[in-house]
Amino acid sequence: MLEAGIDIIEISRLERSIKRHPRLLARVFTPAEVAYCLARHRPGASLAARFAAKEAVMKALGIGLGRCSWQDIEITREQGGRPRVILHNRARQLARELGVGEITVSLSHCHAYAAAVALVESSFSEEG
């Protein structure tokens, strides 16, 4: 079974939220995600793309907000630059329970928006 999730976020909205609530960075992103994004030309766009990816993964898994920590879903990069999803703790446990095999994600951003699409392949089937 293949499930999809998609999310889009206004980059400036996330930037304002982080400015008002600096602890948001540590609550939502892993230290590796923060380090990577802050080293980029447009840190806000990179952070927003990862935020959208985390939401898209949650939607594709069907777990919704609150079932796992934001940091339980980590967005890294493979050697060639392709984004990679790493699940930790509760997100990993939920994925196992759902029979999740592979999770792929695609990120994009322009001047104003960041978006992500996640595809989750699982062995679970509603048909039995």
UniProtKB/Swiss-Prot annotation:
Q: Which GO terms describe its cellular component?
A: cytoplasm
Q: Which species is this record about? A: Moorella thermoacetica (strain ATCC 39073 / JCM 9320)
What's the encoding gene here?
acpS
Gene3D superfamilies of this UniProt entry? 4'-phosphopantetheinyl transferase domain
What GO MF annotations does this protein's record show? holo-[acyl-carrier-protein] synthase activity; magnesium ion binding
Task: Give the family from UniProt.
Answer: Belongs to the P-Pant transferase superfamily. AcpS family.
NCBIfam families linked: acpS, pantethn_trn, PRK00070.3-2
Cofactor(s) recorded for this entry are: Mg(2+)
* Name this protein carries in UniProt: Holo-[acyl-carrier-protein] synthase
Q: Which reaction(s) does its UniProt entry say it catalyses?
A: apo-[ACP] + CoA = holo-[ACP] + adenosine 3',5'-bisphosphate + H(+)
Entry EC no(s): 2.7.8.7
- Give the principal location in a single coarse category: cytoplasm
Binding-site positions, Mg(2+): 7, 55
Cellular location(s): Cytoplasm
InterPro entries reported for this sequence: 4-PPantetheinyl_Trfase_dom, 4-PPantetheinyl_Trfase_dom_sf, ACPS, Ppantetheine-prot_Trfase_dom
